[in-house]
């Protein structure tokens, strides 16, 4: 088990009222990082029948969130642990309309009026205390405008892109 029992219990409570179905599509290479992502998301999706895992072999490490089989525009090229674990939880809750700090109707209209397509990439450290706020805000843009994609990238895994 990757996630501790108390975390799984909290996730069960948080996701108890999900109204949509969510697929966490992971693409992963063979090896330790891919196995770690699989273990984490296997545990994560085990807490609710509306959460499913789809696993694909790939040369990159990636997690994409789908709502009712459709892309949400949210991708993590990371193992979203540390501070970014909250970003993953909120991505699901916000996609379901149950998260926190959801924008009001006026702000949603402004998001929907943005000239798209836009592909936003955030390079983050899983120990950064400010990064989750940025990631969560940009995820909201993707949720409210289908022409926007946001990808959070762990700079410690994708060092060649950071340099």
Regions found by a protein language model. Give the residues of each.
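Thioredoxin-like thiol-disulfide oxidoreductase module
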Residues: 39-68, 147-163
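Long, charged amphipathic helices and adjacent flexible linkers at domain junctions
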Residues: 98-114
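N-terminal secretory signal sequences
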Residues: 8, 23, 53, 92-102
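Non-catalytic, surface beta->alpha helical segment in thiol-disulfide oxidoreductase systems
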Residues: 66-100
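Local sequence-structure signature of Cys/Sec-based thiol-disulfide redox active-site neighborhoods
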Residues: 2-42, 112-151
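Short amphipathic beta-strand starts and helix->beta connectors
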Residues: 7-11, 105-106, 163
């Amino acid at each position: 088990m990757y996630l501790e029992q108390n975390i799984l219990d909290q996730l069960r409570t948080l996701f108890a009222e999900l109204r949509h179905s969510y697929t966490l599509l992971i693409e992963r290479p063979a090896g330790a990082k891919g196995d770690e992502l699989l273990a984490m998301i296997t545990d994560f999706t085990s807490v609710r029948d509306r959460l499913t895992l789809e696993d694909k072999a790939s040369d990159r490490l990636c997690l994409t969130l789908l709502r009712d089989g459709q892309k949400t525009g949210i991708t993590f090229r990371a193992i979203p642990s540390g501070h970014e674990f909250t970003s993953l939880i909120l991505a699901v809750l916000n996609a379901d309309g149950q998260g926190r700090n959801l924008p009001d109707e006026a702000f949603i209209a402004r998001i929907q009026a943005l000239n798209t397509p836009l592909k936003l990439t955030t390079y983050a450290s899983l120990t950064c205390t400010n990064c989750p706020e940025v990631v969560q805000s940009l995820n909201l843009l993707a949720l409210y405008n289908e022409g926007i994609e946001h990808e959070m990238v762990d700079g410690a895994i994708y060092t060649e892109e950071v340099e």
